[in-house]
Structure formats: structure tokens, C-alpha cells
Amino acid sequence: MAKQKIRIRLKAFDHTILDQSAEKIVETAKTTGAKVAGPVPLPTEKDVVTILRSPHKYKDSREQFEIRTHKRLIDIISPSPKTVDALMRLDLPAGVDIEIKL
């Protein structure tokens, strides 16, 4: 697996869980001897939904809700088979979405 790079992209609604997960991944990769670049914070997506407060009329009275999607990027440079095995066994919280590209 020489000259390879693993790119891990994390997404979550809660930034604290996201940062903890990123720290676990970085710690695991460093203990197995791989070089790590990151975690790099990517731009936060903000999704805003506007709805009417009233079910029938009063168009001027509206309410807005938003949900923010926080993202982080981690590059693992020249990973060993031991690194890949350790990352596969890593237990992360349920609220974190992980995309791995080799």
C-alpha cells in the first residue's frame, strides 16, 4: 500500500461529536505509524426552511428553522495494512457519517 492516500470525509449535525470522532481517527492512524493531514474543517452547510405559523391564513407570520451540517476532511498518507485494519475496527458515534476514498 505504498504511495497511497486514504481520504476520510466526516459529516455530522453536532460539531462536538464530529471533532471527537476526527480525533479518534487521527489518534488511531498515528499509533499505527501513518502520516496524517487534518482534520481540515470544510464549509458548514446551512439548510433553512421557512413555514407559515398558522395553518390557514396570516401569510406575514412565518417561522424559520435551520439545520447545520458540519464537515471535516482527514488525509492518511501512506497507510499500512495495520492502519487500515485499525480504522475498520474503530467504533464511532451513530450521528457521524463517514465517506472513505482510497
From Swiss-Prot:
Alphabetically ordered keywords of this record: Ribonucleoprotein, Ribosomal protein
CC annotations in GO: ribonucleoprotein complex; ribosome
Short name of one Pfam family: Ribosomal_S10
SMART domains referenced in this protein's UniProt entry, alphabetically: Ribosomal_S10
Molecular function via GO: structural constituent of ribosome; tRNA binding
Recorded superkingdom: Bacteria
InterPro entries given in the database record: Ribosomal_uS10, Ribosomal_uS10_CS, Ribosomal_uS10_dom, Ribosomal_uS10_dom_sf
A GO BP entry: translation
Similarity comment: family membership: Belongs to the universal ribosomal protein uS10 family.
Function, in words: Involved in the binding of tRNA to the ribosomes.
Protein name, UniProt field: Small ribosomal subunit protein uS10
Annotated source species: Clostridium acetobutylicum (strain ATCC 824 / DSM 792 / JCM 1419 / IAM 19013 / LMG 5710 / NBRC 13948 / NRRL B-527 / VKM B-1787 / 2291 / W)
